[in-house]
Amino acid sequence: MKTIYILLTRSGTLLSNLVYAVTGANYTHASLAFDDELSCLYSSTRKNGYTMFPAGPSREYLNRGVFRLRENVPCALYALEVSDEAYARARRRTEHMMAHGRLYRFNVLGLMLCALRIRWKRRRHYFCSQFVSEVLEKSGAMELPKDSTLMHPNDYTKLNGLKCVFQGRLADLPQRRQMEFDPEETVVSVYLGLAMGLLRSGVCRVREIF
């Protein structure tokens, strides 16, 4: 038997606050992890770790991106015991989506409709909890109580078979406390770096045209 982890958070970003305003749920984001240290998380989310878009299947890290800058947000960590075969299938499916991330998009409309309990499925489009749900269901790791397009992060707090191993502030999550952080990384430095990256990208595209 092996363990798959599901991390639930409410990051306090614009999109998170919008979902929270509509649903009132404790958690608005879901991620998967395949190791006890949570060294790498997987979800359908912001691809650069900071800005809302571009978004799609992406890796997340507890000491980078939004998780680095918003450490006081509420979170809950759940453990799911699965067979070795289901674990391997879930990990293989996840890594495949990461490797072909350019083929996938973030399911913005689906996320909004999920909050209203309306099913909306579009090929290769996923929001966070839909991504987590499909990986777990299609790998045979667990059965869902409803369609993946209707699974909200908060639904995982009510599922049988999941064990809550931590609940509290993200800053107090044991795995995060063991990680190293870049002391120079601040909100200002992050967004300045992103702005410079966009500027360089724009300059390169202009050069390609001419």
Across the structure, where does each feature detected by a protein language model lie?
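Cysteine-nucleophile amide-bond enzymes
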Residues: M1-F210
